[in-house]
UniProtKB/Swiss-Prot annotation:
Topological domain spans for side Cytoplasmic: 38-104, 318-410, 630-643
Function statement: Involved in cell fusion during mating by stabilizing the plasma membrane fusion event.
The keyword Transmembrane helix appears for this protein: yes
Lineage: Eukaryota, Fungi, Dikarya, Ascomycota, Saccharomycotina
Gene: PRM1
Keywords: Cell membrane, Conjugation, Glycoprotein, Membrane, Transmembrane, Transmembrane helix
Protein name as annotated: Plasma membrane fusion protein PRM1
Coiled coil location: none
Transmembrane segments annotated in the record for this chain: 17-37, 105-125, 297-317, 411-431, 609-629
Lipid bilayer topology: Multi-pass membrane protein
Entry's Gene Ontology cellular component terms: mating projection tip; plasma membrane
């Protein structure tokens, strides 16, 4: 009954039903739920610690939201109000300057309309008379000089022959006189008299009316007073008070006219301690919430674990029944094989030797089944027994022990344990790689940039807001100028075109009527005095109106707005400085805490895998204990049989 076989019998099989696949699956589910619960508790504890530790920061940001928003809105509003008032004063000063310019131009126009017209006509008449006289005198002098020179030339040519005859007579008389007179009487000779008459006739060729008369007339024409001189002098006298007024207006500083911006109230930022804030005042309530969550988590874990344990115990019943049915079938097969009489047709049926030989060569069917369907454990057991056992009984014990340790049920925790150890090793490698990356230079640089980019992001957002607001102001200004003042541009452009065409027509008409005549310039002057100057003044006024009549709305300057909102003299709060300085440390600590949590979870998984390996290793002492128990029972039975 207690003989050792190289395979497992029913009791030995039933000793391993607790490591069936269903029980192991439920045990793994329990471990998974335990890991999940542990992770959840760790997360809740981290959340609790984080919330309680960051109460001061929460209160700080809450104070910024509660008190900082009115503060910065007040500063921005004060800047916008001051900027709007400054722009209003500048617009008013520009309007006063424009009004002074308009009044000055109107005064110039009235002077030119009433006084300038008569003065222009008077001086134009004088200038025209002088110019006509100058032109006539030039022509008369030219004709007279030309005629006198021609007559002198003809007279000189007629007397040329007489001069030659007289010269010969004079030469003859000179020679005769030298014979009868001495040298002292030479000057009273007829020769000298004839020479003087000849000289007076020759000088007629150079007689002409002097051109200095034309020069004097031209000088008189150039010295004739001009309308432009009088007009410019009059405008200069009239412009003096207006220019003084405009200089005084331009010298006014719009900013200095405004009151000090510090007089406008700005709500202060409460940078005090946050001990009496919302978070700190409800610290007990926060802890109570986390205690309730942990209690609910523990109750859920206990209920789930008990339920799974009960189901795992219930799974032992079908496993035991399956092993029992399997053993019954194997036993029936073995009994059937033993009862079959396999006789040799050539052997002696009455020979006892033949029966003894058949009995000794008969094999165990269960052992054959074990060798066929569990080949690896059988071969390993036979190989180990062949190299270590010295007796048949020892070989059977070794084969049985290896069959027990390497049974299909015992191999399940072995496979799960080895797979778990491999997976845990891979997870530890991944966590180690993440820790190396966390401590790398690139991560530190990224965290430092995260700390220093806050001011840049705020400035960028403020610049984007200013740009969008200025774009809206530009569109509104263009719409107002086009909708309300567009008719001014259209009207001034049309009137300027009409005035320019009228001036061109007047000039062309005067040119056609008086071109190449002495009256051309006087008529041009008269027309300019009566009509042209007025039209040109109107054209200049329309051009000025076209260029200056428009609405210019004030723009928002990003740099000024940033300077107005910023507070360089505000004392830095230690809590705020600590928040900025510890930002990278808190991020690094948070990531390291997550990695630590993952490492703890992987460590638990490794312990579970090692526990599964321990379950498989536990089969060895259990098998040895069962072998010892069977040997003890066999020896006790032998002692009972001995009389």
């Amino acid at each position: 009954m207690y003989a050792t076989q190289p395979y497992l019998e029913l009791r030995e099989r039933l000793s391993q039903i607790w490591i069936n696949r269903y029980t192991l699956l439920l045990m793994l589910c329990m471990v998974k739920i335990l890991l999940f619960t542990s992770s959840l508790r760790f997360s809740l504890n981290n959340s609790k610690v984080h919330v309680l530790e960051e109460c001061s920061n929460i209160e700080h940001y809450y104070n910024i939201l509660r008190n900082g928003t009115p503060h910065y809105m007040g500063k921005m509003g004060n800047y916008l109000v001051a900027h709007a008032l400054e722009a209003t004063v500048e617009s008013l000063l520009a309007l006063l300057t424009s009004l002074a310019t308009v009044v000055e131009v109107v005064a110039h126009f009235m002077i030119e309309l009433w006084l300038g017209t008569y003065a222009c006509l008077l001086f134009s008449a004088a200038h025209g008379a002088v110019e006509v006289a100058t032109n006539v005198t030039e022509k008369v002098i030219g004709v007279a000089n030309k005629t006198l020179i021609a007559a002198a030339n003809e007279l000189d040519n007629g007397l040329d022959g007489l001069s030659k005859v007289l010269n010969k007579i004079i030469e003859t008389g000179t020679k005769v006189s030298h014979l009868f007179k001495d040298d002292d009487e030479e000057h009273a000779s007829p020769e000298g008299q004839f020479k003087k008459i000849n000289l007076t006739i020759a000088s007629l060729r150079t007689v002409k009316i002097p051109e200095s008369v034309n020069d004097k007339l031209r000088s008189l024409a150039e010295k004739t007073p001009d309308f432009e001189d009088v007009k410019n002098k009059t405008k200069g006298l009239v412009s003096i008070p207006f220019q003084t007024l405009k200089n005084e207006i331009n010298g006014i500083n719009a900013t200095s006219m405004l009151k000090n911006r510090k007089l406008m109230s700005v709500p202060p930022i409460d940078m005090g301690d946050a001990a009496d804030g919302v978070c700190s005042a409800n610290r007990d309530g926060i802890e109570s919430v986390y205690r309730n969550l942990n209690s609910a988590l523990i109750y859920s874990l206990v209920a789930t674990a008990v339920s799974l344990a009960i189901v795992a115990l219930l799974c032992l019943i079908p496993a035991a029944w399956h092993e029992y049915r399997q053993w019954e079938r194997l036993s029936a097969l073995r009994d059937h094989e033993r009862t079959v009489d396999c006789k040799d047709p050539f052997a002696d049926t009455h020979s006892s030797a033949s029966a003894s030989t058949a009995s000794s060569t008969r094999c165990d069917v269960i052992q054959n089944y074990q060798g066929v369907f569990h080949r690896a454990p059988t071969l390993i057991g036979e190989w180990v027994a062949r190299h270590t056992a010295h007796t048949q009984e020892g070989a059977l014990r070794i084969q049985w022990l290896l069959a027990y340790v390497l049974s299909p049920r015992a191999l399940v925790p072995l496979a799960l344990g080895l797979a778990g150890v491999l997976v845990c090793g891979c997870q530890f490698l991944i966590i180690h790689a993440l820790r190396i990356q966390l401590a790398s230079t690139s991560t530190r640089d990224s965290l430092q940039r995260l700390e220093t980019d806050t001011a840049g992001l705020v400035a960028h957002d403020l610049s984007r807001w200013a740009d969008s607001t200025n774009a809206y102001i530009n569109g509104t200004e263009a719409s107002v100028n086009a909708g309300l003042l567009g008719w001014v541009t259209t009207a001034t452009t049309a009137l300027n075109t009409t005035v320019a065409a009228l001036l061109a027509d007047i000039d062309s008409t005067v040119d056609r009527a008086f071109a190449d005549t002495p009256l051309h310039r006087p008529m041009v002057t008269v027309v300019s005095c009566v009509i042209g100057n007025k039209l040109r003044a109107i054209e200049a006024g329309l051009t000025w109106t076209h260029d200056h009549v428009r609405i210019a709305l004030p723009r928002i300057h990003t740099a000024r707005l940033r300077d107005a909102v910023a507070e360089p003299d505000l004392p830095t709060h230690p809590a705020y400085t600590a928040v900025l300085q510890s930002l990278s440390d808190r991020l690094r600590h948070s990531v390291d805490r997550v990695l630590h949590q993952c490492c703890a979870a992987v460590r638990i998984e490794l312990y579970v895998s090692l526990a599964l390996l321990g379950l498989w290793i536990l089969q060895t002492p259990l098998g040895l204990a069962m072998l010892l128990f069977k040997s003890h029972c066999r020896r006790r039975n032998l002692r009972r049989r001995v009389p």
